[in-house]
Amino acid sequence: GVENAYGFVTSIVDNGATKTINTEEEVFETKSIIIATGANHRKLGVPGEEEYGARGVSYCAVCDGAFFRDQDILVVGGGDSAVEEAIFLTRFGKTVTIMHRRDELRAQKIIQERAFANDKIKFIWDSVLEEIKGDERKIESVRYKNVKTGEVTEANFGGLFIYVGLDAVSEF
């Protein structure tokens, strides 16, 4: 049978036929391991990201999209999650702009086609976010840089959704 165990794993040792799992409280010996660590949203690490968390910066369109009704929304990322969430956010936003550091999206073609066909979605290509600005209560604008030309631009957005990947919650 399967035995579920929960805890903070400090190390795993492969003994060949068995594995030793050391946690903060117990040691387990087993033949197989299923690791379900969960994940945290990857952050950009730009000025303003922490300060404006829950005040315009979000990592969950389903959770926070309605707060930005009739505003211009920026989505950073180019993969499936970023593009799918941008499409979802068109239900609320006046416009939704996808900013991607490359000149093409990485999302699946069918998802890209839906985004390109949506009149509410705009694109900023070859660009990276450099700073999030606001009035201490909410974000008002972002500064971004075109990675090919070096041109720096500031643009107004009421909401910012960041989808640049996930990091597994593991330190072993």
Region locations from a protein language model:
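A short alpha-helix capping/helix-coil boundary motif
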Residues: 65, 89-92
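FAD-binding core/adjacent interface of flavoenzyme oxidoreductases
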Residues: 2-71, 148-150, 161-163
